[in-house]
């Protein structure tokens, strides 16, 4: 049930505080909510399910890009051993300085030369979405359907709202009382073995999400 959570501090000695102002070393955490959940076990509709990301490091390259490096394991609830794999994901930053990680790990096709331009027309379509909400136990979070329409309509299962693309690879989703800040970029879909539009972001209550485009609107 490993996962990666984030707190921040102005001092390396702490205290490290999460999105809601809670100390990461607080004695009580009955609902498993302390720490901004950056990554947990996950499964897209196609491909391998993964669990237990952890033992991470953060890298910062000469081009100013940030990366999360961690171990992770393929889903295995048997008594047989399962070796760890390594994933590297780019880190993006919210307007107020909180990190959220890319929806897919880096692939051999990622050159590191920069993010390709993306238009609003390219973004519209059907998606799979994973919402990284804290849970007890954390377990494996599965993807659900999502839609971004040309007129700004947003749909995620029964949730309806609006979305907008503000260019410079940034966008916004709003529904109910929530606003989600998102980054938009082209990347490799590890499950479908193709390049696609990927989204990642952070909700106004500190819940991160991933999404990947899987098809055109009818």
Predicted regions located by residue number:
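Carbohydrate-active catalytic/glycan-binding domains of CAZyme proteins
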Residues: 1-218
